[in-house]
């Protein structure tokens, strides 16, 4: 989302692929570190540089870091792209939808295969995200909030205050919703290599 809002290329790596050591946390189980760059090749170069096991971050993955630029010149022939036209157009700026569809058709012309998919309704998942993120953010900022409340902006104050209202049962239910969402998306990825959709519903700011 930050990259889309700025009109640049962003890459959100697998959780744990990049160390979060030294980063001001928002939500422990949701935070990712990734490059914001000019183009896809730059994203690969940056990820190659920052990925890998970090002894200072026990959640960082021990898996070997592959060559992030391998195959970048091979084209997209045979790539299976999942597309839900209703999903990318509902409540989305028409110009943005048209731009996404144009990009997909370009990839199709280069040999990619477009596969019709049905994305799940994300409204319930976004509600669960709010429960998880706000409560984890409160935990991450417990040393400075609310003791230094005035150092926080009004929006983030409200976000943390909402997190303080979350019960253990509500957090557990939200985590179950997250697991269900992950399962649904994993099933979709059994048939496609990528899902093509806008990162947000409006053009860059």
Predicted region positions:
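FAD-binding core of FAD-dependent oxidoreductases
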Residues: 1-10
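Short, Asp-centered acidic motifs that coordinate Mg2+ and/or phosphate
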Residues: 34, 193-195
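Short connector loops at secondary-structure junctions
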Residues: 112-129, 160-161
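Short glycine-rich, flexible loops that bind phosphorylated cofactors or substrates
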Residues: 90, 203-204
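Acyltransferase
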Residues: 94-118, 141-147, 171-192
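A short helix-breaking turn/cap at a secondary-structure junction
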Residues: 9-98, 103, 121
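Short glycine/threonine-rich loop-to-helix capping motif typified by GTGT followed
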Residues: 94-96, 125-135, 205
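Short helix-loop capping/hinge segments that flank enzyme active sites or metal/cofactor-binding pockets
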Residues: 70-85, 132-186, 198-203
């Amino acid at each position: 989302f930050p990259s889309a809002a700025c009109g640049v290329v962003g890459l959100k790596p697998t959780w744990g692929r990049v160390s979060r050591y030294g980063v001001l946390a928002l939500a422990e189980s949701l935070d990712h570190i990734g490059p914001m760059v000019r183009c896809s090749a730059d994203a690969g170069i940056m990820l190659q540089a920052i990925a890998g096991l970090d002894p200072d971050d026990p959640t960082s993955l021990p898996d070997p870091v592959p060559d992030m630029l391998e195959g970048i010149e091979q084209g997209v022939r045979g790539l299976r792209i999942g597309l839900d036209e209703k999903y990318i157009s509902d409540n989305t700026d028409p110009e943005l939808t048209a731009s996404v569809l144009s990009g997909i058709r370009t990839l199709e012309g280069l040999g990619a295969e477009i596969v019709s998919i049905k994305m799940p309704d994300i409204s319930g998942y976004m509600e669960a995200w709010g429960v998880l993120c706000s409560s984890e953010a409160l935990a991450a900022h417990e040393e400075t909030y609310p003791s230094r409340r005035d150092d926080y902006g009004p929006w983030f104050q409200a976000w943390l205050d909402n997190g303080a209202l979350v019960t253990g049962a509500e957090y557990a239910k939200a985590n179950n919703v997250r697991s269900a969402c992950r399962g649904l998306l994993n099933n979709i990825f059994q048939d496609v290599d990528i899902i093509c959709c806008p990162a947000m519903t409006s053009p860059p700011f």
